Amino acid sequence: MNRVVLIGRLTKDPELKFTPGTGTAVTTFVLAVDRRFSKDGKNEADFIPVVVWGKQAESTANYMSKGKLIGISGRIQTRSYEAKDGTRRYVTEVVADEVKFLEWGNKQSSGSQGFNNFESDPLSYNNEDNYNDDITPVDEGEVPF
């Protein structure tokens, strides 16, 4: 089984490219993922390279920017290539098949616009709703178990 699920922040704006010939969108970025605190109490992070293909690649590049919180799931993949100096280079990266934007906002916006920011839209959260009014009583004699 090769499955990875990560939540972290973009270290810089995603880079969108298109493959020659087919024109398939591919976006690359580095995700900073917090680790548990070290023995001396300092917070540490791992920096994970991520690749996204297709429509998700375009959406990620268009709507995400440096510092935004993002969740991804996918697989770890290793590959190698020959560098310009003739040496063989090896790369380990996550190929994401699912991307979740945990903070919204285009590249021009500033500040956090996360899902949990109820103050920005007071209609999105109302703790005065009484959902118990919608419950219909059930005669326990009618329940088959």
Swiss-Prot record:
Q: Which NCBIfam families match?
A: ssb (TIGR00621)
User: What would be an example GO MF term here?
Assistant: single-stranded DNA binding
Alphabetical keyword list: DNA-binding
Q: What is this protein called?
A: Single-stranded DNA-binding protein
Q: Which residues form the SSB domain?
A: 1-103
Q: What is the lineage of its organism?
A: Bacteria, Bacillati, Bacillota, Clostridia, Eubacteriales
Identify the stretch(es) annotated as Disordered. Answer: 112-145
* One term under GO cellular component: nucleoid
UniProt xrefs under Gene3D superfamilies: Nucleic acid-binding proteins
Q: Which HAMAP family match?
A: SSB
The record's note on quaternary structure and interaction partners says:
Homotetramer.
Record keywords: Ligase included? no
The yes or no answer to whether the keyword Cell wall biogenesis/degradation is present is no
* Bias kind Polar residues: ranges: 112-129
Q: Which GO terms describe its biological process?
A: DNA replication
Q: Which InterPro entries does the UniProt record give? A: NA-bd_OB-fold (IPR012340), Primosome_PriB/ssb (IPR000424), ssDNA-bd (IPR011344)
Q: Where is the composition biased (Acidic residues)?
A: 130-145
